[in-house]
């Protein structure tokens, strides 16, 4: 991939499309990178109404944007508008990164990369692990794909609506036939049998206690068992706080956000950026927003 700084002197336009997008940390993260690498560019947020997504993408292409990130609720719809998909986007059925190149709209899924590498950074190995995925949406599908790809020993999807979870199971097993995937209801979780527990829902953003929703809480980890509670939400949710208090390893979604963003940046600009700078930037942005919120109370 060519480093675009050597390819053109034109200003680079990037962005993120979703609804809502006001909470997104991606503009702060990517604009910091553009400044760091002395790239004349800007990363902008675009809140798009449902039904207007295809027009928004075509409009950004007409405006000569280099690429955009796609967030909720448009990741699945983005698959349909792309002329080309990478293997992960095609398999998962979800696009979070678009590149406008050679009159084509190219779709990528870097969320899978972000989750996989963040687990590795934490010192855990998905291979042969027993993994619980809480949720049945697009994020759960991505997590399940990564676990199956890495030969997890057992994957159990826990969701209120079993039909959605069964669909994920069926789709992923069609790609990885030997994967061991089960579907259960929330109340049947036995934390003692699990190595990695992933919250793939948005519960926790507003302070909801996911353990209350699923009807069970992990016991104190007196044996110091190696077990990871992982939240795809990038703030300290009750899920993370309670698991940590009980003595377990925890990881929120900050590194997943950073790593998927780093991969997107590389796709657009041919340059893999400095991960630590990205992590520092989003931590500072979260702290700044928290301070601003507290000052208005």
Model-derived segments and spans:
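Rossmann-fold NAD(P) dinucleotide-binding segment
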Residues: 205-229, 237, 241
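Short glycine-/small-residue-rich Rossmann-like dinucleotide-binding loops
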Residues: 73, 199-203, 233-234
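Short acidic low-complexity segments
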Residues: 176-194
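Phosphate/diphosphate ligand-binding glycine-rich loop within oxidoreductases
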Residues: 2, 7-122, 236, 242
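Rossmann-like NAD(P)-binding element
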Residues: 161, 189-212
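Glycine-rich adenosine-cofactor-binding loop
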Residues: 18, 107-109, 119, 123-124, ...
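Rossmann-fold NAD(P)-binding glycine/threonine-rich loop
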Residues: 225-275
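Short, conserved loop/helix-junction motifs that constitute active-site signature segments
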Residues: 5-8, 126-127, 149-151, 213-226
